[in-house]
């Protein structure tokens, strides 16, 4: 029940971010290169990088700190980065998307469990945070010589911070959806 809902929530968010990044790449809005990743890598490698980038952007959208290439992304300091303004706005849209998905998950939890207790939201948030932390463990990437100047590029997140921030963020947003679905 709740574990399956948390997996679906993470998967949906990741999939939407991935599809939007692929579409952006295909129509020429390749934000991959804003992180210092060389445009000389093959299309197959670009899709591998995009699949990883989607995980980090989904993490960022959950208020986690993501290091991608030469950029450290964290929402409060986003506008201090050298990323283009349109990509910064896209990142903010991804934050809104994650909030919407978690809000809807809260509504679904309320509709399924019909309780005034915080327990379903708490359990969901624990599962969600553990899944996000697991993703951050398994999605560490180091690209040797993949930058414009031939330097190594790393993409990673801090596992402990991901666990904590994902729990807090998912609990707050899911709880709001959970409570507002009872509001008449």
Set out the residue ranges of the language-model regions.
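Long, glycine/tryptophan/cysteine-rich extracytoplasmic
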Residues: 18-91, 137-171
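Alpha-helical transmembrane segments of multi-pass integral membrane proteins
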Residues: 108-184
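Hydrophobic, Leu/Ile/Phe/Ala-enriched alpha-helical segments that form helix-helix packing faces
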Residues: 6-10, 14, 23, 27, ...
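Transmembrane alpha-helical segments in integral membrane proteins
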Residues: 9-16, 77-113, 167-184
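Lipid-exposed faces of alpha-helical membrane segments in multi-pass integral membrane proteins
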Residues: 16-19, 23, 93, 97, ...
């Amino acid at each position: 029940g709740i574990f399956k809902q948390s997996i679906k929530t993470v998967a949906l968010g990741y999939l939407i971010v991935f599809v939007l990044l692929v579409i952006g790449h295909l129509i020429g809005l390749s934000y991959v290169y804003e992180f210092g990743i060389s445009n000389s890598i093959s299309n197959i490698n670009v899709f591998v990088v995009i699949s990883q980038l989607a995980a980090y952007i989904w993490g960022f959208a959950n208020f986690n700190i993501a290091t991608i290439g030469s950029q450290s992304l964290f929402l409060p300091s986003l506008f201090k980065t050298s990323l283009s303004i349109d990509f910064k706005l896209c990142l903010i849209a991804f934050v809104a998307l994650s909030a919407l998905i978690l809000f809807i998950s809260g509504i679904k939890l309320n509709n399924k469990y019909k309780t005034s207790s915080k327990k379903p939201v708490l359990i969901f948030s624990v599962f969600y945070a553990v899944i996000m932390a697991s993703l951050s463990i398994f999605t560490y990437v180091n690209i040797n010589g993949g930058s414009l100047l031939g330097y190594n590029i790393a993409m990673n997140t801090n596992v402990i911070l991901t666990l904590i921030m994902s729990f807090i963020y998912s609990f707050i947003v899911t709880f709001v959806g959970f409570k507002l679905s009872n509001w008449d």
